[in-house]
Structure formats: structure tokens, C-alpha cells
Amino acid sequence: MSKVDSTSTKRAKIRKRKRWERFDGYRLKNIPSFQKLIPFTMKRRSASLNYFEITYDAGEILKYLDGKNRNLEENFDPNNPIKQYTYTQFFMTLIVRMFALRPRLNRFVSRKNIYQRHNIEIAYVLKKDFSDDGEESTTVDTFERDSNIDDVGYILHDSIKSVKETTDDKSGDFVDTLMKLPNFIITFVTWIFDVLIYIGYCPAVLRKIDTMQSSVMFANLGSIGLEGTPHHHLYDRGTCSIFISVGRIRKQKYLGENGVEERDVVDFKITMDERIADGFYFVKSFELLKEILDNPQQLDDRLKEVPIDE
């Protein structure tokens, strides 16, 4: 585990993007020859999927968030944009930390090459109201690798506030305008976008609205009360290599020392592009996930150092 620092405002050192590199990542060279070969034999992301289903003890999550929120009430600061520490904020911080410490998870395959992404980018969907016809907005937020739970919270606050308070949904307006055009023009426009992404030069307007250009797609299905979480596929289009869905924290019975007991658990469903790393790396990453869930207090601190994937 990398060292953490709870007081310094200095951010961890990161790799600087070079001028000639793709907008979203840089090509990796120091990887085994066999792994370089895999994208040539497994050409599509949809044909390279691994599915993981894991249930973790959530007891420490509940204690951690309860303590954070009690401290928030006792030390109320009207200037603090974080009014409550939520499950979504916690799980997104967890993802940022896991991707920072296990950087191969932040890889993607394009043009049969393996790339490391410049930033950690989490894509998710926000609903303005929970109804069948409630308006949705797709969002991609960018996080620094050393971020703690407050850093993530500030970015989430701004994104959620922007979506819920504005009636100007640029992504929705763009799609609405596009879909009014004839089919052959729609086909041509999407083809142009795909070509630009393929060669690594994507227009800024597309980067901000296209959830398929991200490190991971995240769905907190517990926020809509869903206990069982389905697996979600990945898309051949774009560069997203991982989809994580999390269900509602639930009670699970188990056989303890005093007979049948109950504990709080949470279900993770993870879909991954197996071309970005080997199975052993994925397993060790899930061990880190469990270690953080068992000791969530470490998310209070920024990482002092982050590994760089070359």
C-alpha cells in the first residue's frame, strides 16, 4: 500500500502527457509480448469479457459513513459543499483509489495496441427525478489519482448540482438535434466521431458527453433500491474497459459462533476487458478492494505516491 498524507496540500507526482500522444492515453511498451499479441487474436471488446460477482461485508462502510456524517453535523460549516457523505461518493472514491493503486485497470485497447489512460475518468448516469419518464443526463467526471473522499465529493457535488439545477442539457440538446437529421447524415456523423476516437483525436464536445470514453462506467443501483445487481456488458465502441455495478446494502444470514447471525453485505458485479491485464492482476485488485472496504478510514487521506504504468 502506498503511503498516505492527511495534511499536505501537495499532490502526488503524475506522468505528464506528451504532445504527440492520444487525447485519452499513451501507448504502453513495457508489457509481455504475449499480451501484446492478444488484441490481434481477440479483436472485439465484447468477445473479451470476464464477469466477476463478489459479495463483501459492508459493516465497516456503515460505521465509517455514520461517523463521517455525525462529524459533519457536529462541525457544521456552511461553506462546505459536502452536506452528507453518501454511498455513491464512497464507492466512487473506492474506485478512484483502486484504479490509482492498480493502474493496469485503467488501460484500454485501441488499434490493437494497449494504452494507459492519462486520467481516472468515471462515467455515470444522473436522473433529475426518480420516475419512468425522469430526465437522464450522462456524465463523465475526471479525478486525480491521489484523491481522497472529500476531493471526490467536491467534484460530485458540482456535477450533480449542475445537472439538477440547469435546464440546458448540452448532451441532450446535441443528441436531439442529431436525431432530427436524415439517417445517412447520422451514420456519417457517428462514423466521423468513431474515426476520431480510433486515431486518438476526439473533439472536446464529445469527450464531455460520451460515457464510452472513460476508465469505468459505474452504476450505484442501490440508489434506486435495487438489491440484486445485474451484469452489464461493455461496448465495442469507445475505450471503456470496466463496468462496475453495486447493489443496495442488504442483510445476509450466515452461520456464526452463536448460531445463525446476520451481517450487512454489498454485492459488486464487475465486467472487465481481459485484454488489459491477466487474471492474477484482477484477483489481487479485488483483494485490495476488500482491504479498503475493511479499512475505509484510509480514504480520508490523499495518496502520497501513486504507481505509474509504463
What are these regions (language model features)?
Residues 2-310:
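C-terminal catalytic/motor cores of large multi-domain enzyme assemblies
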